[in-house]
From Swiss-Prot:
EC number: 3.6.4.12, 3.6.4.13
Keywords tagged on the record: Acetylation, ATP-binding, Cytoplasm, DNA-binding, Endonuclease, Helicase, Hydrolase, Immunity, Innate immunity, Isopeptide bond, Methylation, Nuclease, Nucleotide-binding, Nucleus, Phosphoprotein, RNA-binding, Transport, Ubl conjugation
Species of provenance: Bos taurus (Bovine)
Protein name per Swiss-Prot or TrEMBL: Ras GTPase-activating protein-binding protein 1
Residues with PTM Phosphoserine: 149, 230-231, 249, 252, 372
CDD domains: NTF2, RRM_G3BP1
Gene: G3BP1
Amino acid sequence: MVMEKPSPLLVGREFVRQYYTLLNQAPDMLHRFYGKNSSYVHGGLDSNGKPADAVYGQKEIHRKVMSQNFTNCHTKIRHVDAHATLNDGVVVQVMGLLSNNNQALRRFMQTFVLAPEGSVANKFYVHNDIFRYQDEVFGGFITEPQEESEEEVEEPEERQQTPEVVPDDSGTFYDQTVSNDLEEHLEEPVAEPEPEPEPEPEQEPVSEVQEEKSEPVLEETAPEDVQKSSSPAPADIAQTVQEDLRTFSWASVTSKNLPPSGAVPVTGIPPHVVKVPASQPRPESKPESQIPLQRPQRDQRVREQRINVPPQRGPRPVREAGEQGDVEPRRIVRHPDSHQLFIGNLPHEVDKSELKDFFQNYGNVVELRINSGGKLPNFGFVVFDDSEPVQKVLSNRPIMFRGEVRLNVEEKKTRAAREGDRRDNRLRGPGGPRGGLGGGMRGPPRGGMVQKPGFGVGRSIAPRQ
């Protein structure tokens, strides 16, 4: 019976489950996923403050892994992408959160290139591995969202002339929770407000998580079992992905000295490469881009006629709103910007009293606002009675809330700084952030690609449900 070839996504998800399970249970065995010519990058900076270089080969990778002091690592996988690449390889991108040695969770991105091991079908090893913590790349910077209360009252005309589009970060996510003893939480995606005022929304296709009963997946292996296998054998379809790891063998992963026949060439594309069509921008965005050009003219006419004719469109003047008694209370107290802090990445279930008690440790809190506009995470503002607590909070960053949530704390910008940012954004126009990725792409790894199976499957290739 000829078994069907597993899809790249199925291969990627099974690899992710095995890799992060071993990272939690036996990090000293992690180097067995790699081969003699594998490359490995795991974030961090060297002694000169520059991004650390890659290391090559099992010995160097093992030394690098041990230097990370992985202890009781818990991983929350938020998303896994996998695509077919050259010579039946699979490229896998993982996004999630990682906690090492019971420290706070940190967002990370990791990319693997899985190459065929060569001697056994559907057996892979890690040829390239790139890992980065997001806070090492982006830092704790976050752009302050537009205030909605005071500036709507005091500057209604400016708000008309500079409409700002709030980007929709509510992408589709699914929890890819690793099936070891890791914590399983159905959390909302940790998204932050984008700094660009006029983003062009793009929608990426998201792979549906479907169980494929007829496709084989890679057999699970464990370091405790030392039984050596000689040839692959089919297993029953009833075998499931959640079987105990200790029932499989890791000996075949390290005992084989493979010939270079399984090397990955740099030419040729396998016939099963998954081509995902990129979504095209909608043509209806064109008339929307013309609206800001027409609004200033209409606003100018409204201002010229304001003395005799009340405006028919747009926000009502402050004079009329004040008569209704819904605006004047907001203007009673005006706190200096130096007494205020912007707080981002707030948990969606946090309440004002809990957050106020937390910041009371730094000084007297006179006012606290939490803005929850339907998008997560929430953000807010804390007002102290003096500027000293503000500087105290800023000097103690990073600020950990509940011991596990890292708050994005920034000093509130002055009005002139906010207006300057808006002018810069309008001059720059729509598009992505300025600049590009730091550094350049590294060339191909040195030498031939003689593999040591890391993502080995042991004795057999078993179909999974």
